[in-house]
Amino acid sequence: MKDKYIIYFISRTKANMIKFIENKLKENNLTELIPTHGNILTALYESDKKLTMKEIAKKIGKDKSTVTPLVNKLITLGYIQKEKSITDKRVTYISLTSKARDIEDTFNFISSQVRETAYKDFTPEEKEEFLRLLRKLNSNFKMENEK
């Protein structure tokens, strides 16, 4: 039975979380954004400064080649902007625009709804244990991939 396999549950949970986020974006008239844009916006909101593509990729745990099209889309949508470093023309910084700042409270509210839903009916101990096990699972695959 498929339900016995952890990968099945992880996959279904991810799909359900994405659908939940898509619904929340729609409810808040942010339909031009997709869930994966959230990682980039979060990195920029939390740093509260300009970041390079490399720094964004590292913060969200993705390859630069994966981040580039997402950043380009956010630029097209007007949420972020690129600017060249004054001291080193090889370096390009990414920063939030006023449009992104205008949705920051809504974005944070959606993020809190995701967390609340994820941990609904979890005791504090269950939450800690769940996070510990997820970190361990992630570490197992990360170590194998780095061989």
Which role fits each region the language model picked out?
Residues M1, P124-K147:
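C-terminal regulatory/oligomerization modules of transcriptional regulators
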Residues K2, I6, T36-H37, K99, ...:
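N-terminal positioning helix adjacent to the helix-turn-helix/winged-helix DNA-binding module
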Residues N72-R132:
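Charged, amphipathic alpha-helical coiled-coil/dimerization segments
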